[in-house]
């Protein structure tokens, strides 16, 4: 068996609506489907889904880091902060040729916002 690509990223969240305010409303992911405590969001330009699963924290499980390609790191970072994200590393040009910010969402998951440096 070989891996052909990334299908979905599953993230546990304490509050589904609060998570949707960030991922759907601030970052622009689109809702594909949802049932009960789960909702799947489409990541534009890929076949990847971000699956938000509302449930209590599970002790001992590691967090997930998710990296999103955006058109404007600074604007996306500002929108994410307005929706409840916390800045870990402010937007900055990186030596590998990307502009990147690192944030945590309201549940403490790490997310990176990147775009090719100008």
Please annotate each region the language model reported.
Residues 1-18, 47, 64-68, 114-118:
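N-terminal beta-strand motif that seeds the catalytic metal site of vicinal oxygen chelate
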